[in-house]
Amino acid sequence: MTTGSKETKENYIPSAEDSQQRGMNRREFVTAAGALLGTTATVGLTGANAQSAEAGKGSDVKRASPGHTETRPVTNGGPWDAALKTVREWDPKWAETCEKMTMNPWRKSVLPRKIIELISLALNAACTNLNQDGTRRHINAALDAGATRDEILMVLKMASLLSIHSCSLGAPILLEEAKAAGVQLAPRKTGEATPACDKMREMGQWNQAWDPFYELDPAWTDEFFATALGVYASGVFTPKEVELFSIALDASYTHMYAPGTRRHIKAALKLGVSMEEIMEVLKLCVIQGVQACNLGVPILAEELEKRRTRKS
């Protein structure tokens, strides 16, 4: 599907054939559609080289060679805002060491600058974080790095759909505890149409982890999958890039969703993503911890100034 196409509708579920006509092959479609939803696709290609080459089609992102760590100049503050200047004044030694560590991905070329900023955006905008200042900072930095409106919007959609893990956690517990308490679901209509879920089953991509919330509310589950399929089959990002974003969202310190982290690391490796690239994503997760300083240091400075003023 062409970026920004008006063809996508609310509950449109693209078929593999539709995706081929829009520049995606079946493997790319299945991989992209299953990314956030917790599936791994291995359709039609064998061998890491073939997978890697296919995954890169249609991408304008220049890939760094695995293990290549050429130093490059930093043109922005990375994860930092003005708080860094204050930290330098208060504790220059710690500020120097912390800045060196946190700016590492921006100084190295393991990942393209645009992808670094989009991953950082995902971490800040995620429904488990909702950091307004960080979201604005990395949207601006991503635009400066060449990201398009549709790419940024896609990251925000992914950051929104992360919330499905509430059902991944809670639905099995609800069924178990209801059974123990002797409580049963109220009768409902049989034969409800669930085309999105049916599509996933046809492709062999249905995950049994979804069975509990499908059992509890099949119609709503299908609505969710229709939403997710419409997003991930768009072709805005390559399957490799989708997996990197998914790893970041699941491994984030505000989420720490182990099943998804493992699933997406496994899928990324199968697609030819290097260990170094995946480690960069994990580093970016850790580095966003300096948001504590971005938040707290200005408040501390303000409160200290108020006390100083009252005493004088």
Where do the language-model regions lie?
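Short acidic/histidine-centered micro-motifs embedded in hydrophobic/aromatic stretches
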Residues: 122, 155-159, 177, 248, ...
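Amphipathic, charged-and-aliphatic alpha-helical interface segments
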Residues: 116-131, 241-257
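Short helix-coil transition sites and intra-membrane helix breaks within transmembrane domains
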Residues: 127-133, 163-167, 253-259, 290-293
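Acidic, glycine/proline-rich low-complexity segments that act as flexible tails and inter-domain linkers
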Residues: 2-23, 28-44, 51-115, 144, ...
